[in-house]
Amino acid sequence: MRAARMFVKKLARKKLVPHRVKAELFGSLGHTGKGHGSDVAVLVGFEGELPDQIDTDTIPSRLEEIRNSQTINLNKKHKIKFLESDLVFHRKKTLPGHANGMKFSAFDAEGNLIKENIYYSVGGGFVIGENTEQKPIAEMHLELPFDFQTGEQLLEMARSSGKCISSMMLENEKTWRSEQEVVNGLDDIWSTMSACINKGIRTEGVLKGG
């Protein structure tokens, strides 16, 4: 969802309004995409949504509208053509940067390619563009205050530092963002989880994928 939104925002910044867009998912995303809802995420991402802001109750009706009308509301501003064949799952192909790769393409009315970008989903909700780093993603590394590879190492760090595991994880998170941002993010996660639990208790029927 984030990657698709990044693509349409880039189109908007360049003042490009395509006649049609296409999404291709590679590697793990291509192999398990529909089962994990990646197709849904791409479609609503093209419509400008973010995972932490979208009203999930509206998704089924929006998907039905896209399929019935064969159009998508690009970035919530432009109705453009979108066919089911414009969402491609490459189950046996990968992109060079990472196992979870996506390629988004935009075309004009004559079918000419006007913009194309590659993105990688690198875990933890993070998405980077193809040119974010010059070196391969696998080589990217940040120095963490408590860098561990095993549970045994983590416990030894707790003993030697006198810190509990949650305190050490907070210090690691502060490598990327401020402590207040971490706390606010955790509050958002808990609110989402709590709402999901309450919705599950109230709702009847069969859970998708179950």
Task: Describe these PLM feature segments.
Residues 176-210:
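Accessory "access/gating" subregions that flank catalytic or transport cores
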Residues 116-120, 162-169, 183, 194, ...:
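A structural signal for small-residue-enriched, beta-sheet-centric alpha/beta enzyme cores
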Residues 2-25, 57:
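Non-transmembrane, aqueous-exposed alpha-helical and coiled segments at domain scale
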Residues 1, 32, 179-182:
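Short, N-terminal intrinsically disordered low-complexity segments that are rich in Pro/Gly
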Residues 1-4, 35-37:
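Conserved phosphate/anionic-ligand binding catalytic regions in large, soluble enzymes, centered on
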